[in-house]
Regions:
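Nucleotide-sugar-dependent
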Residues: 22-26, 256, 310-315, 322-344, ...
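Membrane-proximal helix-turn-helix segments that form the acceptor-binding/catalytic region
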Residues: 31, 126-133, 154, 178-196
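Acidic anion/phosphate-binding donor-loop and adjacent secondary structure
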Residues: 173-177, 222-240
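Carbohydrate-associated surface elements
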Residues: 202, 218-230, 319
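Conserved donor-binding/catalytic core segment of Leloir-type glycosyltransferases
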Residues: 241-259
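Nucleotide-activated donor-binding/catalytic signature segment of Leloir-type glycosyltransferases, i.e.
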Residues: 281, 289-313
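A charged, aromatic-enriched C-terminal amphipathic alpha-helix characteristic of glycosyltransferases
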Residues: 388-415
Length: 426
């Protein structure tokens, strides 16, 4: 922070674990879109593309004609189009999005293999460094979400390296058989990071030894104002749930077996056949082994699939209670679900499994330890739905935990680091 109290305008380069255009926004897009209001943000897309699509995007448009809409190849025109490592550059709402040409066949290589790491992470880091040099981009804050980038990020010209740790990647299904590799990469990243932010107490405890004195707990939050729209009398209910039998017990999020206890939901539907159980979200994300057959077989379970972020408040308005029935185990020990405060902001009663990261909020929700207590908690939640005072307490709690407050904490830490490293007057 400057002597006049003004925060310096920074440049952030975000090495993400998700595409900017992903319909299910998470920490990455929420944080970077808000940072872009006052700072320059460059967002490096994650993932791969088929070679044919890479070629189409790089050379399929005449000079000066972006392809797709809003994209370009940066400053070098046709030279960049012919450069195999040059990114497609797009401007998205004040954020510069870089999509480097990482070929799709990288995804068929085993996680943890030298070849896959070289293509998916090291090549992207190398290509980013070249682009930064070409663009004259010096000393930005490099903000990392995926630990797979490892210590290689220190090769980038940066003023600071931040690791925003939002998940325990060693438990992800995609890294089964490669947990030692991803853990090693995370150790490398923590060793070079100037600041490590963790979204839950279990994550903080796990990373504290990897970056002594540089780890800070900054829990997940929500866009409370967006989800408070669920209380708007003028907001129409979505047609696919508007006429379902009530009460409606709803879940919003990726329907993946490694996180969501599908057995609990099936048991609830069987025990309460007159109720409706609605699951809003894509299926089998990050876990292709997810089996939804037991849910599909139940007439009162409704798998509506992915819905855009903009319409989620309308679905929450339709629910009589919101559930977050995550499995209890290694994969969820460090999870602080974004949907927690989003659900509270809707005003609806919330039922959760006993997630360690949410322990401080147990008094504000209904907590289930097993399948039978889950059914009982849902019944209790339905009975609470008309309690106006309880509804306002839930909304007030969500309002105290916003993206703006989380970002302010993280920027304050960067300011502290600047002050500590600033030259002292004699």
């Amino acid at each position: 922070m400057s002597a006049g109290g003004q925060r310096p305008r920074r440049t952030f380069v975000c090495l993400s674990s998700q595409r900017w255009s992903d319909g299910m926004w998470t920490n990455k897009q929420h944080v970077m879109s808000r940072l872009a209001r006052d700072h320059r943000v460059i967002y490096v897309d994650f993932g791969t593309r088929p070679m044919a699509e890479i070629l189409r995007r790089k050379i399929g448009a005449p000079e000066g004609a972006p392809s797709p809409a809003g994209s370009s190849m940066g400053r070098r025109g046709w030279g960049a189009r012919l450069d195999p490592l040059a990114p497609v550059v797009e401007e998205r709402g004040g954020v510069t999005v870089l999509d480097f040409p990482i070929p799709r066949f990288a995804e068929y290589l085993p996680h943890g293999s030298r070849a896959r790491a070289a293509l998916e992470f090291d090549l992207r880091t190398f290509a980013l460094g070249r682009w930064m040099k070409t663009e004259g981009l010096a000393r930005p804050v490099v903000w990392v979400y995926h630990p797979g980038f490892g210590g290689g990020v220190r090769s980038l010209p940066s003023s600071r390296v931040v690791y925003d740790c939002v998940d325990e990647y060693t438990t992800f299904p995609e890294f089964r058989g490669a947990t030692a590799w991803i853990a090693g990469r995370e150790r490398e990243l923590c060793a070079v990071a100037d600041a490590v932010f963790c979204t839950s107490r279990p994550l903080f405890d796990a990373k504290a030894a990897l970056a002594p004195g540089r780890v800070q707990l900054v829990p997940n939050v929500a866009d409370a104002a967006h989800f408070e729209r669920a209380a708007d009398p003028a907001l129409a209910l979505p047609e696919d749930v508007a006429h379902l039998p009530r009460p409606i017990i709803g879940f919003v999020g990726a329907v993946s077996d490694y996180k969501v206890n599908l057995g609990w939901l099936a048991h609830l539907a069987r025990q309460r056949p007159s109720w409706s159980v609605v699951l809003v979200g894509p299926h089998a994300v990050a876990d292709p082994t997810t089996d939804l057959s037991q849910l599909r077989a139940l007439p009162n379970v409704h798998l509506v699939g992915y819905r855009a972020y903009e319409v989620l408040p309308a679905y929450l308005k339709a629910f009589d209670a919101v559930v977050i029935p995550y499995r209890l185990g290694a994969a969820t020990r460090g999870i602080f679900p974004l949907k927690f405060f989003e659900s509270l902001a809707s005003g609806r009663p919330v039922v959760i499994s006993r997630l360690p990261a949410l322990e401080a909020y147990y008094p504000d929700v209904l907590v289930a330890d097993d399948v039978d207590s889950f059914v009982n908690a849902c019944a209790a939640a339905v009975a609470l739905e008309d309690d106006a005072a309880a509804r306002e307490r839930r909304v007030a709690l969500a309002r105290r935990n916003t993206w703006e407050s989380r970002i302010a904490q993280m920027l304050a830490r960067l300011d502290e680091l600047d002050e500590l490293s600033a030259p002292r007057s004699p």
